Amino acid sequence: MSLFLPKNPLEVSERVLREKIQSADFLLSDEKCSHRLVGLRYDPSRMKGPEVAVVCARHEMALAKQIALSLGKKMYVRPEFSAVLFREYYCGERLAPKDYAAAAELYALFYRNREGTFPRA
């Protein structure tokens, strides 16, 4: 049995982080963009509600911001909501109904600025 071990483990973590950030519709951060970064994704045709695409903490922030900027991801400064998401959810977990209103507000802003149209379920 062959086990693939990368020469540089950081390459793997950077690739995984890039894939997770790329899968997010947009990102939320604290006011200084230095403590936490949380990404949300939602596809109404196949999901019951928004889910957390990526969660980054302090030690990943520099790389995560660099990746997000290179991908052209929209970042919103929402300290309270990003703290709730960071504290209560894991990557890949669907949001609880109690957080739908805050997420819907951000999605409305995101789609209004993006295309002026909303996705249909």
Roles of regions detected by a PLM:
Residues 1-121:
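Divalent-cation
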